[in-house]
Amino acid sequence: DNIGKLLKTLDEMGIADNTIVVYVSDQGYFLGEHGFFDKRMFYEEAARMPFVIRYPKKIPAGKRLKDLILNIDFAPTLAEFAGVKMENVQGHSFTGNLEGKTPADWRKEIYYRYWTNHAIRPAHFAIRSERYKLIFYYAKNLDMTDTENFDFTPAWDFYDLEEDPHENHNLYNDPKYAPIIRQMKKDLLNLRKEVGDTDEKYPEMQELLEKYYK
């Protein structure tokens, strides 16, 4: 109701077409899905963030993006709409995407990492494309505080989000997906290098990757 009041006021003031309105929040929370509460694990319920934007002068109403957007893209996008170009930032403006002109080189995959290590949610990193998700649970404390020591065999999860949108079936050992998984492992390494998250200062991680990255 209050959002409606805000939009109505902008209309009454005659500035709606020249005002950007954004509705956004933090990541979602688990409410029992996968046996979890809170967030942190890289399932869709906790990985996604709502982002609704209205800017009549530039953005067609009713449009829904399928492009992979990260929260580091928010600031460059709003800055560009305001006529400011941000430099030396990790995010990318998606003004073109919102206007229906997604760049040909727009990201096809995203990288995720959760560092803190607990038995209920082991430390992990992951890659997600529009359709597939690959997660590696390495379960090492490294230099993190607020961690636990526990016995855990490193493991992979792989989900086909088109066939299994609720991520109930780990298909990592399904031979049908072996070629896709091999390629995503390569892409995951490339993304880790791209963002400077290669664990070079952790010899135990290098040994772990050599053993399980097959």
Regions found by a protein language model. Give the residues of each.
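Short catalytic/ligand-binding loop motif for oxyanion handling, primarily in non-cytosolic enzymes
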Residues: 30-33, 38-40, 119-121, 135-136, ...
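Short loop segments at secondary-structure junctions
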Residues: 55-58, 83-84, 100-102, 130-132, ...
